Amino acid sequence: MKSSTTSMQLIPTLFFLTILLASPEMVEGQQMCEAKSLDWKGMCLKWRNCRQVCISEGFTDGRCKGFTRKCICSKPCFVLPN
């Protein structure tokens, strides 16, 4: 009976770790800056292709967004202190 209790305690821990590892790395308070891809041509229908183009442009991610399906690249914003 003790092993089933241990298993039941392990499930929430594994779930939490999965969520933690799957979430994007981002410092608290840090915003993401977005820009339209310069190299993408045409409508954006496959976000994986958009992401690869954005990475080749120096961004960390890319997604198809908007009604007109543009490839939008993103990366963490860096704000200089005053």
Swiss-Prot record:
Keyword field contains Disulfide bond: yes
Keywords annotated in UniProt: Antimicrobial, Disulfide bond, Fungicide, Plant defense, Pyrrolidone carboxylic acid, Secreted, Signal
Pfam family, one: Gamma-thionin
Family stated for the protein in its record: Belongs to the DEFL family.
GO cellular component: extracellular region
PANTHER family attached to this UniProt entry: DEFENSIN-LIKE PROTEIN 1, DEFENSIN-LIKE PROTEIN 7-RELATED
Signal sequence coordinates: 1-29
Classification via CDD domains: Knot1
Name of the protein: Defensin-like protein 7
Gene Ontology biological process terms, A to Z: defense response; defense response to fungus; killing of cells of another organism
Tissue localization of expression: Expressed in stems, roots, rosette leaves and flower buds.
Compartment(s): Secreted
Pyrrolidone carboxylic acid modified-residue sites: Q30
Cysteine disulfide partners in this protein: C33-C77, C44-C64, C50-C71, C54-C73
Chain's gene name: LCR75
